[in-house]
Amino acid sequence: MIQIFNPSRLTRQPFFIDLVDYLDQHDDVILREIKAQFPDVAVDKLMEEYIKAGLILRANKRYSLNLPFLESTDDLALDQEIFIREDSPVYQALLEKTFETELRNQTNAAILVESTDFAREKMTLSNYFYKVKNHYPLTEKQQELYAILGDVNPEYALKYMTTFLLKFLKKDQLMQKRRDIFAESLVVLGYIVQNEEGKYELAVDFDKERLSFYLS
């Protein structure tokens, strides 16, 4: 099976995804066969777009895949659109590869340093912002955060989250009398935990000189 990571406007279309599966399983396909397989789709128009983008190859009235499959993870950049076969040798390397992201804000000098997988399925704030912005499917845990934050402005959220976290410069425990969605979000993300007394404690490494919080 072929997987598409970080799909574009074209490659996230349901028809394109189905077409990739179909062409991957059939050889020497002609346009009439594609139209018969997808009777409710504007095949001609969309096929021209895919051919123009270099994703589908047309030769002698036959159609085939022309996807630039990932062959190595050496120069792979986070958020890069890639096509990969699940049975390829590089697929396992892709799943095991990790990246580091940094979130900064305009209110203070705090930095949220987070470790993530390429698919951005790990529970981090950077991954949440990225997926919501691009309308990508959320994991179950990310949906839990969405129920609290929704489609929040990242700068707005970072302002309040980092301001809260920076209070740990002076205190080991923090009390929040009223409900605070940003404190709740930090709990879901794993930055803080609530002890038996209902007070919040820091649950990640904190470099006080660099004002950096490390979510691994």
Predicted regions and their residues:
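Short, amphipathic alpha-helical interaction segments positioned at domain boundaries
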Residues: F69-R104, F206-S216
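Short amphipathic alpha-helical interaction segments
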Residues: Q37-K52, D172-L189
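Minor-groove-contacting beta-hairpin "wing" of winged helix-turn-helix DNA-binding domains
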Residues: R62-P68, G198-D205
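N-terminal interaction modules that seed assembly of large macromolecular complexes
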Residues: D28-E81
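Short, Lys/Arg-enriched N-terminal segment that forms or immediately precedes the first helix
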Residues: M1-R9
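Short amphipathic alpha-helical interface segments
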Residues: T11-E33, R85-K177
